[in-house]
Amino acid sequence: MKNLLFLFSFLLLVNCEDKQSKQQNPKVSKSKIEKKIGSKKDTIIKPEREFPLLTSENAMDFFLEYEKYNKESKVRLTTTFGNIDIQLFEKTKFHRANFIFLIKNKIFDGTQFHRVVKGFIIQGGNSDDRKVLKKRRDIGKYLLSPDTKRGFKHHRGVISVPSSDIENAYKLASPFEFFITQSNQYHLDGKYTVFGKVIKGMNIVDKINAQETDNGDWPVHNIYIKEAIIIE
């Protein structure tokens, strides 16, 4: 009888200790472990820039190298009124490279022909849209030196670069804007850089040039460059 009482007491003691052990050491479920492991924030790595932020100090060197590997020379501007196809001149390599670079980076998409002077020019590439301004900032702030001694004249239908609004010294050229002549404008020779000509769509240039404008030569109705693409 003594032995039975001893055995019963022993089993009771073991059972109590086992319950206490379970209470003190709760199980950690697999899902909780996985949750803890996955709770760390994913590290976001920003992609490296494909090109440097352009400045007046590095732009010419950049385009000298860029033009070696980007030989495209025919582009298309899709406008509110239709397409304008342009042949870029190989001799004005910095301006050709700049134009190709800007097209590949979608800088002209959504801009406007913001200045129209009847019988003279249509000027494009600008906009008051904040998205356009942001894209410009992402490219950089730089100027291109004029390249006016290649023998190209301001015949009807050439594409040329206006002097810069940033600094007008030496007629440095604004890289984000351009104009197309609607008629012969030889008084511009030697002052602005001709770097291409319209090969198809002069009727579209004429149509844009005929639009009504305000006192500042800005078209009353917006004329968009919906898209600029490379065709060859």
Regions found by a protein language model. Name each.
Residues 1-25:
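Bacterial Sec-dependent N-terminal signal peptides
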